[in-house]
Amino acid sequence: MDRSLQSTHAKLVARDIQRLTQSPTESNSFSLLGGACVSRVEIVGTIVSRDLTPKFLKFGVDDGTGCVTCVMWLNQLTSSYFSRWDPATILLLASAARKQAAQIRIGAVARVRGRVGSYRGVMQITANVAVAERDPNAEILHWLECLKLGQSCYRVRIQS
């Protein structure tokens, strides 16, 4: 298994994210059709849905190849997961998450980075970073990067 993509955000389009399959050897990794394993992804697309609750922001990103559901947690101040963290760090994380959530508006083009996972049989991204893009070419450039990386990095070559 190729572990070179485990520590990086793989740039993928929605269609590729939806086609990920659970890795048979690791619970938090998913396999691309080419054979490479990923756990973190990056996608750029238009925000098509937005559902804000006190605990999280759930939004949909459509890049033309499909739509991926993204979840950004906003409960850093009340979650027991963060109870052992430094309070200053928790405040910083909570503040950053709230600012990023405010940028996510329907119709905006956004870049989302986070951990990929499956929830009720559907692939989704648990977003660490979600920022609105100001560059009108960002989505097209992301597509071109995905094509190039798909051909050069994400395909596992069998050495004979």
Swiss-Prot record:
Widely expressed. It holds the Pfam family tRNA_anti-codon. Keywords: Chromosome, DNA-binding, Nucleus, Telomere. GO terms for biological process: telomere capping. Residues 41-133 bind DNA. InterPro entries: NA-bd_OB-fold, NA-bd_OB_tRNA, RFA2-like. GO terms for cellular component: chromosome, telomeric region; nucleus. It is found in: Nucleus; Chromosome, Telomere. It comes from the Eukaryota. Disruption phenotype: Plants display an immediate onset of growth and developmental defects and reduced fertility, probably due to impaired telomeres. In nearly all mutants, apical dominance is completely abolished, leading to multiple inflorescence bolts that are often fused. In addition, floral phyllotaxy is perturbed and siliques develop at irregular positions on the inflorescence bolt. Moreover, leaf size is substantially reduced, likely reflecting defects in cell proliferation. One of its GO terms (molecular function) is DNA binding. Component of the CST complex, a complex that binds to single-stranded DNA and is required to protect telomeres from DNA degradation. The CST complex binds single-stranded DNA with high affinity in a sequence-independent manner, while isolated subunits bind DNA with low affinity by themselves. Associates with enzymatically active telomerase. Plays a genomewide role in DNA replication and facilitates re-replication at non-telomeric loci. Component of the CST complex, composed of CTC1, TEN1 and STN1. Interacts with CTC1. Interacts with TEN1. Interacts with POT1A. In vitro interaction with TEN1 and POT1A is mutually exclusive, indicating that POT1A and TEN1 may compete for the same binding site. Belongs to the STN1 family. This is CST complex subunit STN1. It comes from Arabidopsis thaliana. The gene is STN1.
